[in-house]
Each structure stands twice: as C-alpha cells, then as structure tokens.
From Swiss-Prot:
Protein name: Holliday junction branch migration complex subunit RuvA
Organism expressing this protein natively: Marinomonas sp. (strain MWYL1)
Domain of life: Bacteria
Residue numbers spanned by region Flexible linker: 144-149
Chain positions covered by the region annotation Domain III: 150-200
Assembly behavior: Homotetramer. Forms an RuvA(8)-RuvB(12)-Holliday junction (HJ) complex. HJ DNA is sandwiched between 2 RuvA tetramers; dsDNA enters through RuvA and exits via RuvB. An RuvB hexamer assembles on each DNA strand where it exits the tetramer. Each RuvB hexamer is contacted by two RuvA subunits (via domain III) on 2 adjacent RuvB subunits; this complex drives branch migration. In the full resolvosome a probable DNA-RuvA(4)-RuvB(12)-RuvC(2) complex forms which resolves the HJ.
Stretches for region Domain II: 65-143
Subcellular localization, as worded in the UniProt entry: Cytoplasm
Biological role: The RuvA-RuvB-RuvC complex processes Holliday junction (HJ) DNA during genetic recombination and DNA repair, while the RuvA-RuvB complex plays an important role in the rescue of blocked DNA replication forks via replication fork reversal (RFR). RuvA specifically binds to HJ cruciform DNA, conferring on it an open structure. The RuvB hexamer acts as an ATP-dependent pump, pulling dsDNA into and through the RuvAB complex. HJ branch migration allows RuvC to scan DNA until it finds its consensus sequence, where it cleaves and resolves the cruciform DNA.
Amino acid sequence: MIGRIVGTLIEKTPPELMVDVNGIGYEVSASMTTIYDLPQIGGQVTLFTHLLVKEDSHTLYGFIDKNERALFRVLIKVNGIGPKMALAILSSMSSEELITNVQESDVTALTRIPGVGKKTAERLIIELRDKLGQAAKTDLFSAPAVLRQVQADPRQEAEAALISLGYKPQEAAKAIAGVPVDAANSEDVIKAALKGMLRK
C-alpha cells in the first residue's frame, strides 16, 4: 500500500495530478479541496494516499491531510458511493461541514452536493452517522493544522489503530489509559495496550 508520496508537482489538471518522485511520475486523483491547497507547478508537495486496486486498474487518490483521507475511506464504504462520488462530496464541503450535516440529519444540505439526491443523502446519513461519530472520537477529524504536524500524539495514534482493529472506542481508551507514560511511540503504546487487554 502506498500511504504517502513526497515530490514535485509537474501536472495539475483537476481532478488529476502528476507528482514526480525521484524520476517516477505518479498519476493521482484528488478533490478540489486538496487541489486548492497545492502549490504552483514545480512546487514540492506531500500527499497522503489511498491505493484502490481493481482487476483492470490501479488508481491512486491523494489528500492534503490524513483528515481528508480518513473521510474518503469512510465514504467509499457507503453503499452506492464510489470513489468519484466520494471525491465530489469532499470537493463540495469540508469534513467538519459533512460531519455536522450527517449528525443533524440535514438532507437539504447534502442534496446540494452535485449528484446527491434525496435518497442518497438519506443513505449517507444512516450509514455514516455512527462511523463518523467514532472517527471524530479518535481525533481523525480534528483541525487540519493539527493533523499536518509531523509529530502526532502517539497515544491518539494508538487509540485510532486499536479502533481500526475492531475494538470499541471505550475499550481502546481504557487500554491506552493503562499504558505507562514513558512509552516512546505509538507502536510501543499499541503493544503495551494489547498485552494489557490479553491479560484480562
């Protein structure tokens, strides 16, 4: 899995980009939210990526921060929402706006997104409400400025990892709380938390 690319932006034809990484040009699909934040051609870019593999294609999707990528991954799990529609949604509103609209069951706001009718909006609300609520608790959808920091909080990263492994948010939080504060990084925190849960 390609999780991140760092290189020179050599083409920008929304929604497609090309990034040169050590002489190799990566074709990347991106939302307008990401594209608006990119430098001019020739500038250095860092994109968090999601590789979608199908029988007849390999498509790389790029995002300006982990926040947007996490939301993309949630969206493409919704019945009837493919990657193109997910990018359209991310291009139309911020992650914070989407979370708010889903939690408030605001069908009208969601139908303003191109290609999203009433039935699709209702399905988004039903299928996303719990998923987005859990994601918000892991701080995946916190302020972009925080998400772009190079050094993330290892305990938050570890808690998010445990939830992605299938543990409930409450279980993950309790397990992390029992880890000694001298754990150096998220990997150490995860290992210690898992050992603690296995002892119970």
